[in-house]
Amino acid sequence: MAEAVIQIEVVYASVQRQVLMTLDVPAGSSVRQALALSGMDREFPELDLAQCAVGIFGKVVADPSTRVLEAGERIEIYRPLLADPMEIRRLRAARAREKRTLPG
C-alpha cells in the first residue's frame, strides 16, 4: 500500500525574486521536514532554514519541528527585518511634525 501524501506550498521572497512551490509530502510531516524536502535552501544559498522564522498563512510557527502539516497549508519563510518598525514609525512621525510646523 502506498504511503499517504498531502500537498502543501512553500513560499519565500528575497529582494530579487519570489518562489512559490507546491510539494507532495508524506502525511504527518512536520514543517521542518517539509522545508528540508523543499530544497529552498538550494534555490537561495543565503537562506539558513534552521534559523529562519516560518509561519503558516501568516501565523508564526513556534516550533517547526513539532508542528504537523495539514493538506493545503502554505509554509512561509520569513526574512529578518532590516530596520526596527518602532524606529521607522518614530522617524515618520517626526517628519510629519516638521512638515506641520514649517511656515508657508
Curated annotation (Swiss-Prot):
InterPro entries (alphabetical): Mopterin_synth/thiamin_S_b (IPR016155), RnfH (IPR005346), RnfH_sf (IPR037021)
Top-level taxon of the source organism: Bacteria
Parts of the chain that traverse the membrane: none
NCBIfam families xref list: PRK01777.1
Family: Belongs to the UPF0125 (RnfH) family.
Protein name as catalogued: Protein RnfH
Native organism: Pseudomonas savastanoi pv. phaseolicola (strain 1448A / Race 6)
